């Protein structure tokens, strides 16, 4: 959509923001024109996914973890403590196989999910950062995903499709966002989430301005508005995210 034009701003995920910068689709921003910039978590102000050569190309929006979402009726009193329930074939606490009952995210971040799992279970690979892999580590991660393919009943990319899958299609475990967990719990579905012992990957969204934005003043007003404490706290509660 940003390449097609007609949009002044976009809230981009961390795996898209640098591509937008490299493609010159978004412009450098002047942080002096955003009064609330200094209220941003210092860890995010110069984050590598929106800052290049000391230049800022966006305003941090929200960030959070990718959690393991699971069906509490299937798992009972046994909270899953490992991502192995979605990576390795096994019988779940209800006595049935996990095959075709688990999901996986359809996106590049899932390679990092696999690498993080291997970092814990195969330390001999020497993985220190699931986002920075050498070729051997990358191939091992891909092999794990190929193995997982035999278990996955459906790959998800749309949040509301996953909500429907867990409500109506018999899926019982998957990587997910707290947003879907919140909506399913709010709908009285038997759902909970956990960050397993291997840890979790995360996401961080950035609001960015199109390089040919027609309404630049409004764009800056929006970036300032999104940093307001009321908006950040309410959005964080609703989505299950961490305010910037």
Regions found by a protein language model. Give the residues of each.
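Short, hydrophobic alpha-helical packing/hinge segments within bilobed ligand-binding/sensory domains
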Residues: 1, 17, 162-165, 181, ...
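A ligand-binding cleft/hinge motif common to bilobed small-molecule-binding domains
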Residues: 16-21, 175-190
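Hydrophobic residues within well-ordered alpha-helices
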Residues: 2, 20, 115, 165-169, ...
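Generic alpha-helical structural context detector
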Residues: 113-117, 182, 224, 237
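Extracytoplasmic ligand-binding site segments that recognize negatively charged/polar headgroups
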Residues: 11-161
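Paired acidic/hydrophobic, glycine-rich loop segments that form the ligand-binding mouth/hinge
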Residues: 8-12, 155, 172-177, 192-193
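Mature extracytoplasmic/periplasmic domains
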Residues: 200, 205-244
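Periplasmic-binding protein-like
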Residues: 39, 142-148, 187-211
């Amino acid at each position: 959509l940003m390449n097609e034009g007609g949009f002044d701003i976009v809230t981009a995920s961390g795996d898209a923001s640098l591509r937008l910068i490299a493609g010159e689709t978004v412009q450098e921003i002047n942080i002096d024109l955003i009064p609330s910039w200094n209220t941003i978590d210092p860890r995010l102000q110069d984050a590598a996914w929106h800052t290049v050569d000391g230049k800022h190309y966006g305003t941090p929006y929200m960030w959070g973890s990718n959690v393991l979402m699971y069906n509490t009726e299937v798992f009972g009193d046994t909270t899953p403590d490992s991502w192995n329930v979605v990576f390795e074939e096994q019988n779940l606490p209800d006595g049935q196989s996990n095959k075709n009952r688990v999901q996986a995210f359809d996106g590049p971040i899932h390679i990092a999910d696999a690498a993080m799992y291997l970092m814990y279970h195969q330390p001999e690979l020497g993985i220190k950062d699931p986002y920075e892999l050498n070729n051997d580590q990358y191939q091992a991660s891909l092999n794990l995903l190929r193995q997982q393919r035999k278990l996955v009943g459906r790959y998800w990319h749309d949040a509301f499709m996953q909500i429907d899958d867990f409500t109506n299609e018999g899926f019982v475990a998957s990587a997910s966002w707290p947003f879907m967990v919140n909506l399913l719990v709010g709908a009285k579905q038997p759902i909970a989430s956990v960050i397993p012992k291997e840890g979790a990957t995360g996401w961080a969204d950035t609001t960015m301005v199109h390089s040919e934005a027609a309404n630049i003043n409004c764009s800056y007003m929006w970036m300032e508005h999104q940093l307001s404490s009321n908006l950040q706290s309410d959005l964080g509660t609703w989505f299950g995210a961490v305010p910037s």
